[in-house]
């Protein structure tokens, strides 16, 4: 399965996947916080990133958002967790798009470990996320 370029026409499927993934993997977020972030992802996150997705039997299984050399987002639908789709998308971003940077929620150790396993290292930490919420962000780089 190769990543394909996603467009604005794919946003409904992308945001549905985003929400399912966040609900399954971001247990530190309250439901109202997910409601706070969702319109921000739609308004700023998706349009400001180059999006690529992997489909399985015509279903969007995962996607990655890239801006410059930074991975802005990588989300996998819970039905496809543990099947290597995240690794495929990450390798595509690193090898084909020359990505070397990513931010990850400190409260999401599974994601942090995923990036460490793929060679990323911590270079800085912020106490709050980009929207000022008290969710620490780890800034990682590929060495």
How would you label these PLM feature ranges?
Residues 1-16:
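A short beta-loop-alpha structural element at the N-terminal edge
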Residues 16-42:
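Conserved GNAT-fold acetyl-CoA-binding loop/helix
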Residues 49-62:
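Conserved beta-hairpin
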Residues 52, 64, 69, 74, ...:
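Conserved GNAT-family N-acetyltransferase fold
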Residues 70-81, 105:
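A short, internal acetyl-CoA/4′-phosphopantetheine-binding micro-motif in the GNAT/acyltransferase core
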Residues 82-95, 113, 117:
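Conserved acetyl-CoA-binding loop-helix of GNAT-fold acetyltransferases
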Residues 95-107:
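Conserved GNAT acetyl-CoA-binding A-motif
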Residues 103-105, 121-137:
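Conserved catalytic-core motifs of GNAT/GCN5-like acyltransferases
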């Amino acid at each position: 399965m190769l990543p394909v370029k996603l467009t604005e026409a794919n946003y409904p499927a992308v945001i549905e996947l985003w929400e399912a993934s966040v609900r399954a993997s971001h247990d530190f977020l309250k439901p109202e916080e997910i409601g706070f972030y969702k319109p921000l992802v739609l308004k700023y996150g998706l349009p400001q990133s180059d999006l690529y997705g992997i489909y399985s039997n015509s279903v969007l299984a995962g996607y990655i958002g890239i801006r410059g050399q930074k991975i802005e987002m990588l989300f996998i639908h819970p039905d496809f967790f543990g099947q290597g789709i995240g690794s495929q998308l990450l390798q595509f971003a690193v090898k084909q798009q020359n990505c070397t940077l990513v931010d990850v929620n400190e409260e999401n150790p599974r994601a942090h470990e995923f990036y460490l396993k793929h060679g990323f290292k911590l270079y800085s930490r912020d106490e709050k996320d980009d929207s000022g919420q008290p969710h620490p962000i780890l800034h990682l780089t590929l060495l």
